[in-house]
């Protein structure tokens, strides 16, 4: 199944090989680490090729109490030279204020996070860069953390230890089982992450984060897909929080976005026609 993610392979084996002592005193190369680093570099090389806008919503299903839905808009702006921005605009949800979150992806792999609170209808306050600690906070009161929205630059693929555990079948697709190990698990986040990556497309089929005791913390998995322009795109992404026993569902409304895009194109054509008529 194609997930519509275009890959740009940035594979560099130099420096990716890990030496281990062998019985004969000669170094041996751990192929699983070499392949793991190669796959991580490939994923980090993914880039959007054009601007896009998608209407979304997050449904939060707590362990107790009623479920709630948080609508928001998102768009991708390609800035060129391998850099782009993902922008999320939310409505207020409980204690979480309406805000605009901007994630800036650079050629240096690491993402920067900026937030603006809405001060009036359609207006936003001062742009503030989030600290490393702040990006692990929930997004709009959901089980998604802010840093999770930066995938593939959501930090675990940049850790030095990347190991290919196996090639497996997941959801009927051939996939890599990739283990990412956090060198500093005490600084927040996961101790390790297991990702199942579609071999054909590079799209994630499942991602599970573990704590230092190897207990599951969060599990991400796409559940529904829709064929758009000949490619399958994720329309529903689930995340399970094992600590709070809650679940959040991220939904993508491509039909609404397509209608808005069509209306925008028609408005532009109408404006051009009016200008020519004058």
Question: Residue spans of the language-model regions?
Answer:
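N-terminal mature ectodomain segment of secretory-pathway/periplasmic proteins
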Residues: 31-123
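Well-ordered beta-strand positions enriched in small/hydrophobic/aromatic, beta-favoring residues
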Residues: 54, 86-88, 113, 162, ...
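Short amphipathic beta-strand and strand-loop transition segments with alternating hydrophobic
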Residues: 73-77, 161-169, 223-225
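Bacterial N-terminal signal peptides
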Residues: 8-16
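Flexible, processing/modification-adjacent segments and terminal tails
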Residues: 24-38, 47-48, 66, 105-191, ...
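Boundary at the C-terminal end of the N-terminal hydrophobic targeting segment
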Residues: 19-23
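Bacterial N-terminal signal peptides that target proteins for export
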Residues: 1-9
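Gly/Pro-enriched, hydrophobic low-complexity segments
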Residues: 93, 102, 147-151, 167-267
């Amino acid at each position: 199944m194609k997930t519509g993610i275009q890959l740009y392979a940035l594979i560099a084996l130099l420096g990716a090989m890990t030496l281990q002592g062998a019985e004969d005193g000669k170094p041996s190369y751990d192929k699983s680490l070499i392949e793991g680093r190669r796959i991580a570099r490939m994923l980090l090389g993914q880039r959007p090729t054009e601007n896009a806008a998608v209407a979304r919503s997050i449904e939060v299903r707590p362990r107790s109490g009623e479920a709630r839905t948080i609508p928001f808009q998102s768009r991708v702006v390609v800035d060129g030279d391998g850099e782009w921005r993902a922008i999320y605009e939310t409505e207020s949800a409980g204690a979480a204020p309406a805000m605009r979150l901007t994630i800036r992806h650079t050629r240096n792999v690491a993402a920067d996070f900026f937030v603006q609170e809405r001060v009036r209808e359609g207006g936003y306050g001062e742009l503030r860069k989030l600290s490393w600690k702040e990006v692990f906070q929930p997004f709009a009161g959901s089980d998604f953390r802010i840093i999770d929205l930066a995938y593939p630059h959501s930090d675990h693929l940049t850790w030095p230890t990347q190991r290919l555990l196996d090639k497996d079948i997941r959801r009927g697709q051939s996939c890599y089982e990739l283990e990412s190990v956090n060198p500093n698990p005490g600084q927040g986040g996961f101790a390790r992450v297991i990702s199942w990556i579609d071999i054909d497309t590079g799209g994630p089929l499942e991602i599970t984060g573990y704590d230092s005791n190897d207990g599951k913390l969060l599990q991400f998995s796409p559940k529904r897909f829709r064929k758009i322009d000949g490619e399958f795109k994720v329309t529903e992404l689930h995340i399970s929080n094992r600590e709070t026993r809650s679940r959040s569902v991220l939904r993508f409304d491509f039909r609404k976005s397509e209608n808005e895009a069509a209306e925008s194109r028609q408005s532009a054509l109408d404006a051009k026609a009016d200008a020519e008529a004058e």
